[in-house]
Amino acid sequence: MTAHDRGFDGVERRGLMFVLSSPSGAGKTTLSRLLIERVEGLSLSVSATTRPMRPGEVDGRDYAFVDEKTFAAMVERNDLLEWAHVFDNHYGTPRAPVDAALSSGRDVLFDIDWQGTQQLREKARDDVVSVFILPPSAADLERRLHTRAQDSDDVIRERMARAAHEVSHWAEYDYIVINRDIDEAFAEVQSILKAERLKRERRTGLTAFVRELQRQLET
């Protein structure tokens, strides 16, 4: 059994699903990368998607790239914890690897939208911790979308229009982080994860630990 299985203080715990959502360009992908790089015991959920692979992406690392027929079969077999249709493509989270991680005390990071978060909450409410990342202003969000130079002006306009709808779901999340500065936002998100890992109900080995402590105190 590893330190992650037992928790960092030696007490066994169940893993959690740590969800980051935001409008495109608000910073959730950058924050997800920083969490994976800097936080021990956290792995990124690899989504299945029907969208084309982008330059530099690796199948199985960034996404599991599948065709529409394969994705439909996964939905039919209930192999996905959540799935959504976004910008003419399907995205979904395979169930089996997440279940295995949580059972062994490891945490799984989800970079998904509000639709996926709703589905996760419906299926596994006690395991889900959700964080919505907001930009400091609409102008700042548009500037970020232009700066990353990934999309045409038409696509950026579409993303800005969609952002208004996505932001309307902010109150469905457990925590809200306003990303004015990426380092400050990361510190806030990391603090949320640290606190949630210590929740009593997730620490499955706590009862046995306290009983043993009581036994020692009473002898």
Curated annotation (Swiss-Prot):
InterPro entries: GK/Ca_channel_bsu, Guanylate_kin-like_dom, Guanylate_kinase, Guanylate_kinase_CS, P-loop_NTPase. Transmembrane segments: none annotated. Residues 15-194 form the Guanylate kinase-like domain. It is an enzyme of class 2 (transferase). The keyword ATP-binding applies. Its main location: cytoplasm. Keywords: ATP-binding, Cytoplasm, Kinase, Nucleotide-binding, Transferase. ATP binds at residues 22-29. GO terms for cellular component: cytosol. It is found in: Cytoplasm. Its EC number is 2.7.4.8. Pfam families: Guanylate_kin. GO terms for molecular function: ATP binding; guanylate kinase activity. Essential for recycling GMP and indirectly, cGMP. This is Guanylate kinase. It comes from Nitrobacter winogradskyi (strain ATCC 25391 / DSM 10237 / CIP 104748 / NCIMB 11846 / Nb-255).
